[in-house]
């Protein structure tokens, strides 16, 4: 006890020193100044105010359930969302080690605290009113250093109340502690508070120690909040950045021997991983936002409080209690959030009149008893060490700690959050409140990822866990589809509402990469669109406040758009399952955002229960991930051109069906020096997006020496700039590895070729890993079920580098597109300026597979001796005889009396007329007879008899 009292005395002396410095700046005089720690308040069990509320649900996931954190959240949402919060108890085997307990951290690392005045959380006077009072009942009121909570720094001390306009009730900065010291101080506090017969400085007998139960602590806590008779001050280590202090979960250390901690470091329930798991849209936020994506640590003591609040952007939150005493939570269902806010304003009118955003400050409590009286449902959860608490979107929650403990929390955003997040940012705009992240960036990132997964699924029919998750939120009724459609409708309405005075420009790809772009008036995020003017090119407005930006003439004002409305509606159709739209946006994912599609990011699909090591990427996959990350920045600059480019419509067939066309014509952005075609509103007050055009101000330099050398090497590989020579040389090098087997169904042939199942060939071509060298590619035909044949091209030495499509031509287009990306990485100039790459544009996929090579054709045709694939053989007959068969109802030239070609001799003209009258089947049979290919002996005998009769006839 002496040791605890000594520690408390040193803490109080430090606190007193800080308060004395505040006193000198304050206009109010304290009644007394303590020279020793005084915890004068005592437990009063007879006046306990424990609220009568129902308990929130508790869930006990099985090991299988625990494998997929987001899947489990999705599973329990329907059962728990109506409570606002729930408790999750992990399987018994899941017990991650806590690095915070290591001696170097536990005894040596210090963290800052805040002083909380528990008796003032609900019952206090407004700041302005309290500063006018000359005499205070409580000595400390004059010493409160008013603070403002910031997500970035946690606690930012203001000017100690010297200015009424600046002072806001909050948490005063307290002393720094180590975890060991804080635990001892909490023990001292509880011994003093709950054992009134002992003086704080005397020894307490072990048999007299009393450990209050949770219900005792809860009753006393709300007595202090509702009807305090004494001053109760505690400390709270809140909002501690884990990047600085350290996380309570182990982190993976590459290069070190694998241990038990490493298994937990890669677990999905490790809060360092949770926010960016596959399926959480926060995965598309590239910045490590402290408190949202990077967890915060919370070190509590008895009665330390987290006041009523809702998560930023109405996100889900997950809290894990690493060690220590329980934490009592209270939750309100999200659909009662507005009712809760109204009750708070009704019961605390003076505080809200002075500070309308009071609920954003996390400094005010209101008893669950009062809330229930007003008809607001409240639920309780008691979290113990090793357990999780999940809060749902827009669910207000609060609580207090029963003693010393360490907890960690982070946000997560499954797809069902998107509708809540959209409502949040629209509300922030009306309140003119800054946001923590870009909702539109997350929405578009999720939509593009889902589209790419749909594209992969349409080709391979393989449902990986990631693809299956995105597939579930698509279709017309899918959660993601609905969220994107709603946002596109909003964007269209806002564009159409701007009736005059604005031209449209294409937004730069990196418009908001290096700095946040927000509306000058309401702070709305401007990732999707922004309004500006030549008079203030670095000042922007949202579409709602576009007309409030300035009063300049219409010719000087413009709107920047990241995607046209046609493109956005195509994205909606893609999510609904339209194959053409899927193809278009999958191409955009590959070409425009190569660092964002799944193949580049290569998820580590995290497991647990207990944590299973995540699947590692091969060296090739890791190299591809790193390379594409570097290429993406270069790609953004390459896709611009120094000439004006007309943006193609979504409906254009060449854009829909060929990714390379959208790559050539896409423009990432402009600045104020760009030439812009003004686009006025058309009939009905709508923008005519067909007229949007832009001109880049950054023409690329072609002076790079390394690029020149690369061009020479590429020329050498392709056989020079002669396109025909290059492709001819490549076609001759096709090696047939397997002819496969015939499939007599639609789609398994075309007019140009037969596609045997299991067909496999080898060809040399520029390497997608190193374009300066040739490598072997394996081309094969697989069975994709109802889709028919699936064409796949893979690098022979690195099979994980593969490209698949339902079209042989497009399959090789994907290879050439990848080649362009690799060349961009090595060459600092546009692909369009590399004339040596022109042969890439003429590469024929059928030829690269070998389907146009004579030796391959002969082998493949032998698989169909009966000519069952009529589409192919009919076209072949036409080519052989040089005449189209006469369609039913048509007449040939001779019947019409048309003149015959005089250059042909009489016999040829007669033969051509005869052949035109034949059906395709008859032509094929005749060809077989004349060439000796038919095996039908009866037909051969009939033909011989016919010839004999013709010779006998006069």
From Swiss-Prot:
* Site feature (Involved in histone H3A7 recognition) residues: 171, 363
Per the record, the domain of life is Eukaryota
Q: What keywords tag this UniProt record?
A: Chromatin regulator, Dioxygenase, Flowering, Hypersensitive response, Iron, Metal-binding, Nucleus, Oxidoreductase, Plant defense, Repressor, Transcription, Transcription regulation, Zinc, Zinc-finger
Polar residues composition bias: residue spans? 29-38
User: How cofactor binds (record note)?
Assistant: Binds 1 Fe(2+) ion per subunit.
Disruption-associated phenotype: Early flowering (especially in long day conditions), but normal development of all organs. Partially redundant with ELF6. Increased H3K4 methylation on specific genes, thus leading to their derepression. Slightly increased levels of CCA1 and LHY circadian oscillators transcription factors as well as of other clock genes such as TOC1, PRR5, PRR7, PRR9, GI, ELF3, ELF4, and LUX associated with higher H3K4me3 levels near their promoters. Impaired systemic RDR6-dependent post-transcriptional transgene silencing (PTGS) associated with reduced production of aberrant RNAs (e.g.
**Biased amino acid composition, Basic and acidic residues:** 645-670, 885-905
Q: Which Pfam families match?
A: FYRC, FYRN, JmjC, JmjN, zf-C5HC2
Q: Which residue positions hold the site described Involved in histone H3R2 recognition?
A: 285, 516
Where is motif Nuclear localization signal 2 found? Answer: 470-477
Instruction: Give residue ranges of zinc fingers (C5HC2).
Output: 519-571
- What mutagenesis or variant effect is reported for residue 298 to A? Decreased demethylation activity
- Listed GO cellular component terms? nucleoplasm; nucleus
Q: Where is this site: Involved in histone H3K4me3 recognition?
A: 290, 298
What InterPro entries does its record include? FYrich_C, FYrich_N, JmjC_dom, JmjN, Znf_C5HC2
What are the boundaries of the region Disordered? 1-46, 148-170, 641-670, 884-905
The site annotation (Involved in histone H3Q5 recognition) covers 312
Q: Which reaction does it catalyse?
A: N(6),N(6),N(6)-trimethyl-L-lysyl(4)-[histone H3] + 2-oxoglutarate + O2 = N(6),N(6)-dimethyl-L-lysyl(4)-[histone H3] + formaldehyde + succinate + CO2; N(6),N(6)-dimethyl-L-lysyl(4)-[histone H3] + 2-oxoglutarate + O2 = N(6)-methyl-L-lysyl(4)-[histone H3] + formaldehyde + succinate + CO2; N(6)-methyl-L-lysyl(4)-[histone H3] + 2-oxoglutarate + O2 = L-lysyl(4)-[histone H3] + formaldehyde + succinate + CO2; N(6),N(6),N(6)-trimethyl-L-lysyl(4)-[histone H3] + 3 2-oxoglutarate + 3 O2 = L-lysyl(4)-[histone H3] + 3 formaldehyde + 3 succinate + 3 CO2
**Under what conditions is it induced?**
Circadian-regulation with peak levels occurring at night and lower levels after dawn under both diurnal and constant light conditions in a CCA1- and LHY-dependent manner.
| Gene Ontology BP terms | circadian rhythm; developmental growth; flower development; L-pipecolic acid biosynthetic process; negative regulation of DNA-templated transcription; negative regulation of flower development; negative regulation of gene expression, epigenetic; negative regulation of long-day photoperiodism, flowering
The record's tissue-specificity note reads:
Expressed in shoot apex, primary root tip, trichomes of young leaves, leaf vascular tissues, anther filaments and styles. Detected in inflorescences, leaves, stems, roots and siliques. Mostly expressed in floral organs, and, at low levels, in other organs.
- Quick check: keyword Membrane in the entry? no
Write out the residue ranges of the motif Nuclear localization signal 1.
136-143
Q: How would you summarize the oligomeric state and partners of this protein?
A: Interacts with NAC050 and NAC051/NAC052. Interacts with THAL in the nucleus.
Recorded family membership: Belongs to the JARID1 histone demethylase family.
User: What is the name of the protein in this document?
Assistant: Lysine-specific demethylase JMJ14
Source organism per entry reads Arabidopsis thaliana (Mouse-ear cress)
Organism lineage reads as: Eukaryota, Viridiplantae, Streptophyta, Embryophyta, Tracheophyta
